[in-house]
Amino acid sequence: IAKRGKAFNMKIIYHSRRRHLQEESMVGATYYPKLEDMLAEADFVVLVPPHTAETDHLMSREQFKAMKPTGIMINAARGPVVDNEALYDALKTGKILRAAIDVTDPEPLPLDSPLFTLENLVIMPHIGSAVVETRRKMFSMAVEQLMMGLRGERIPNCINPQVYK
């Protein structure tokens, strides 16, 4: 993400639990130890952490309040990383300009979710696996497991393991 942003002459800033010096030097990124300090400076906030107890509702009311009113948030992580109510409020009241999400909590969103009423929110289906490397791995796993099945071996990711009884 940082490399692509750099190609558009974006200033790259980031927050993480740990500093990544090698990646910083590759794209000229600036590390912010405090999330809210980074949010106050960022024009675009792209979320990509795993969902853990620590990152649950990482973006909630306080974090949206810290963002610029012209800020754009993109959640490409997991749905629960963003508090839906706080996101709705931030977009509805103009605390942030726009948002785009390809993950929701719950997945899928109920059809009556107020998020669907917002014109400044783009909701897309999750496409996290749609990268060449991941698709190659998926293809390799499928072929490997097909061959295992043809050889009569137990398939490790079998969705109906009762066939082995």
Residue positions per predicted region:
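Short, structured coil segments at secondary-structure junctions
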Residues: F8, V27-G28, T117-E119
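Conserved anion/nucleotide-ligand pocket segment
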Residues: I1-K11
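C-terminal helix-to-coil terminal segments
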Residues: E107-K165
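Rossmann-like adenosine-cofactor binding region
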Residues: R18-P114
